[in-house]
């Protein structure tokens, strides 16, 4: 991006002229379904103050900082360990979501999250959200849909494919059996 820089990456920018950054829009999207005191943000230590500036109702202990940029898995593991220690044996619903998604139908999104919470309360499952692809895209991961889950508008995951080449992406879209991987995961601890 021409505007995004190391000192202020895209999640801290107001791309749409709304007066809200992508991070602020993400927090706003989750407020109706997750109390602010239950939200943790994992970020690089260099962005700690920027997070607290943009989300002033977060306490400093809700911003978990990694000393160096790594991939997503260590960040998720760090946050889950923290949630586990905070929950003191009681269960906790966990949603992992990036701070740079654009979601236009936020009410529909929140309904889906609430449905996922209900599902994981009754089932030992990890839920991931997929989106119907509109074109072959080599920059996204894909989820191959498996069998439908009885009584739910959900299906099991048959396979994940990370960023396929164009030929494979075209086959995925043509088959109708694949979704784009949103990177949003929901489960119960």
Give residue spans per PLM region.
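Short acidic donor-binding/metal-coordinating loop in glycosyltransferase active sites
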Residues: 99
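Residue-level detector of conserved, well-ordered beta-strand and adjacent loop positions
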Residues: 1, 13-16, 144, 161
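Conserved beta-strand scaffold positions in the cores of enzyme catalytic domains, especially
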Residues: 12, 63, 126-128
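Conserved N-terminal catalytic core of the sugar/cofactor nucleotidyltransferase
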Residues: 2, 6, 14-96, 104-108
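Conserved core of the sugar-phosphate nucleotidyltransferase
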Residues: 105-189
């Amino acid at each position: 991006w021409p505007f995004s820089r190391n000192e202020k990456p895209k999640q801290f920018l107001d791309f749409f002229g709304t007066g809200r950054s992508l991070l602020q829009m993400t927090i706003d999207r989750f407020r109706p379904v997750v109390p602010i005191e239950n939200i943790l943000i994992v970020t690089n230590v260099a962005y700690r103050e920027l997070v607290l500036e943009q989300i002033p109702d977060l306490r400093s202990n809700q911003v978990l900082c990694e000393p160096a940029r790594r991939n997503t898995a260590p960040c998720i593991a760090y946050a889950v360990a923290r949630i586990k220690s905070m929950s003191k044996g009681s269960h906790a619903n966990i949603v992992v979501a990036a701070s740079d998604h654009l979601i236009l139908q936020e009410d529909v999104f929140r309904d889906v999250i609430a449905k996922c919470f209900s599902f994981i309360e009754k089932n030992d499952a990890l839920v991931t959200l997929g989106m119907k692809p509109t074109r072959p895209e080599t920059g996204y991961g894909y989820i191959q849909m498996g069998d439908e889950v009885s009584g739910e508008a959900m299906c099991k995951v048959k396979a994940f494919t990370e960023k396929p080449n164009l030929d494979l992406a075209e086959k995925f879209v043509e088959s109708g059996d694949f979704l784009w991987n949103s990177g949003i995961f929901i489960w119960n601890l």
